[in-house]
Amino acid sequence: MAVDTMESVAVVAVPFPAQGHLNQLLHLSLLLASRGLSVHYAAPPPHVRQARARVHGWDPRALGSIHFHDLDVPAYDSPAPDLAAPSPFPNHLMPMFEAFAAAARAPLAALLQRLSTSYRRVAVVFDRLNPFAATEAARLANADAFGLQCVAISYTVGWLDPGHRLLSDYGLQFLPPDDCMSREFVDLVFRMEEEEQGAPVAGLVMNTCRALEGEFLDAVAAQPPFQGQRFFAVGPLNPLLLDADARTAPRHECLEWLDRQPPESVLYVSFGTTSCLHADQVAELAAALKGSKQRFVWVLRDADRADIYAESGDSRHAKFLSEFTRETEGTGLVVTGWAPQLEILAHGATAAFMSHCGWNSIIESLSHGKPVLAWPMHSDQPWDSELLCNYFKAGLLVRPWEKHAEIIPAQAIQKVIEEAMLSDSGMAVRQRAKELGEAVRASVADGGNSRKDLDDFIGYITR
């Protein structure tokens, strides 16, 4: 591809302002910039800062290849998560979501207008929760819009047709959105979709690959809303690290600790950035980890606030942790701040991942050949756990979704930990995850389906 052709095209990435969405579009932005494209990343100021601070797996200098733009929105409340809320959905983020949905359009429109006068073509890659970006792209004669699918493409099959043949053939259960998300969030999503209905979209970019979801990709392509659109399954978007990559400085303390552990001996425990465990559940999980006598790295932190820079940094678990860390010294490590998940999953000492089953975490874990102990919390996570355990066969279920309001006792958690780490059935799941990891990594290698789709996407936007 001629350099002048690449430089005459601007890619504008418009993420939804939540961690699991911010990082997927930043990974894609870095991939495209590494291929010589001019890439612009646009989000509210705290979320630009957050995305830059938390991205990992890349050479830090790579961020210099991205043009970052602030989308100014009015001030919004940034409360702490409500630990007494009846639903695990992070409804404390709704003021920020509402402010973004109402106000991000105008600064984005101004940015697109400005770029359209400087570049031959503008490709707007927007999180599908931001349909207004497609509307603004359609106002420009030299712009195309592409939705980014930040969740499993199979989730879209269930959303459009819960009775689809693929679900029934594999015995998969899809839960209605109202069961797993707050009514306020579902209403916001539908309202935004209705307001932007009819905005032309040139195609769909997906953080998945045919090795994982090939059947579901074909099923979605056949659905009326997507017929005629171009599909680019370019995942995994996250870098694929070798164990050696996890040993480059500067290093997090947990990686130094992992260096001292035997191969495939450590359970990594983390529940993402939008989930909290009640104190009683923390105590039960702690008892399970201690009772299992397995090595572990446990990231114990509450859900992000809307503005992570407004957080106090104090842990509500300080008193509990002082005793627990003493009792498990040498066996486990508790991290109360941000942890480098990709490096942990790539590390040779890590055997498995107990997770909330966000799609980022699922695909990061599988791409490094690590099975998942599934503990879904909200949103698409119950579906991801269903896909993981009953379709990929690379996970074990810790907590069924129907028990999400219950405290899971230590004995039940410990049983799953021991199955994953010690039993023949757990070994089969771990072997299956390794096989999937090899297939996923082959997808992004030369000649792989995801590499081809990324090449096709770049070829299309630079045509």
UniProtKB/Swiss-Prot annotation:
GO biological process: protein glycosylation; regulation of cytokinin-activated signaling pathway
EC number: 2.4.1.215
Tissue-level expression: Highly expressed in root. Expressed at much lower level in kernel. Weakly or not expressed in expressed in stems and leaves.
Binding site for UDP-alpha-D-glucose: A339, Q341, H356, W359, N360, S361, E364, D380, Q381
InterPro entries xref list: UDP_glucos_trans, UDP_glycos_trans_CS
Function: Utilizes UDP-glucose as the sugar donor and catalyzes the formation of O-beta-D-glucosyl-cis-zeatin from cis-zeatin. May regulate active versus storage forms of cytokinins and could have an impact on seed growth.
Protein's name in the database: Cis-zeatin O-glucosyltransferase 2
Organism: Zea mays
Gene behind the chain: CISZOG2
